[in-house]
């Protein structure tokens, strides 16, 4: 990751525990930094400890409670101080390449990083909630065969600022500043966009802690869901250090099929994965694990598959909800969606066993924003980079 970002960022040495990245223009981007790092950055530019502590508190409030992107409107900071802050610091947002709105109201943004790579995020409005699906990586290493993102190679991890920036940008678009505890349009965040969050653990953890901070965005951990394809060694740590809701991309109940469509199963099998789910901190009947199950015609959608799913969940005594996801096609995809009748029968079998098994309503399909469809121009850039390297 650092080798990719190094072309656009340098590092500023501070008394913080870690170096702080500096932009091409020499300024330090405050978005995504912890309070400790902001204070250290201010001190590195000449402020004493007392002033740095005060300014950190003020900046935090303006960034995460009011959505400020400039210093000149920060009315509780002295006018003489504001130009100095603007000279040395920035409060960024992701660059928007395109924004599309589906006929059903779903919005998809194509975003660009400072070093020129693309990634995507999606906002899904409903009557009682608004869910933002955000990315953790540019590309992915997991190669899930039904997932469009899985056909890309991994370019790099997103930084803390790039992860948090997606939420900030969405709230800009929804006019949700200043932050308010009730009546929000953006009520939920799911880490189900591009990438495997547990393969970018530190940045995802730090970003979500910032999002949950009570003095800023203040989104409850009950409103945040982290999705994994089954990086078993990191799951317990995620529960302990992040503590948000867990979703697992299961998608099959036999080794043969899951090995094919979710190749990480060859490393961490179904039984090992479900045992890790059972041990996830805080799991109980009031806080269930969500299992994602994409419905693929004649692949994983038989009545036998449904009964085996029930058996597995009951064997591991998992408080569970199963989201049945009609497969969303993408160009040259190797699978077809199960028939509505077969999906309904699958749901019925699971539901009759006492396990919630709703069929997810497809959203944003007309703009390639539905589950499994995200795939940005980052892949094309990767191919161009490879061609340059080869030449």
From Swiss-Prot:
Binds 1 [4Fe-4S] cluster. The cluster is coordinated with 3 cysteines and an exchangeable S-adenosyl-L-methionine. Pfam families: Radical_SAM (PF04055), RlmN_N (PF21016). GO terms for cellular component: cytoplasm. It catalyses: adenosine(2503) in 23S rRNA + 2 reduced [2Fe-2S]-[ferredoxin] + 2 S-adenosyl-L-methionine = 2-methyladenosine(2503) in 23S rRNA + 5'-deoxyadenosine + L-methionine + 2 oxidized [2Fe-2S]-[ferredoxin] + S-adenosyl-L-homocysteine; adenosine(37) in tRNA + 2 reduced [2Fe-2S]-[ferredoxin] + 2 S-adenosyl-L-methionine = 2-methyladenosine(37) in tRNA + 5'-deoxyadenosine + L-methionine + 2 oxidized [2Fe-2S]-[ferredoxin] + S-adenosyl-L-homocysteine. It is an enzyme of class 2 (transferase). The keyword Metal-binding applies. Disulfide bonds join 133-371. The keyword rRNA processing applies. Reaction proceeds by a ping-pong mechanism involving intermediate methylation of a conserved cysteine residue. Belongs to the radical SAM superfamily. RlmN family. This is Dual-specificity RNA methyltransferase RlmN. It comes from Zymomonas mobilis subsp. mobilis (strain ATCC 31821 / ZM4 / CP4). The gene is rlmN.
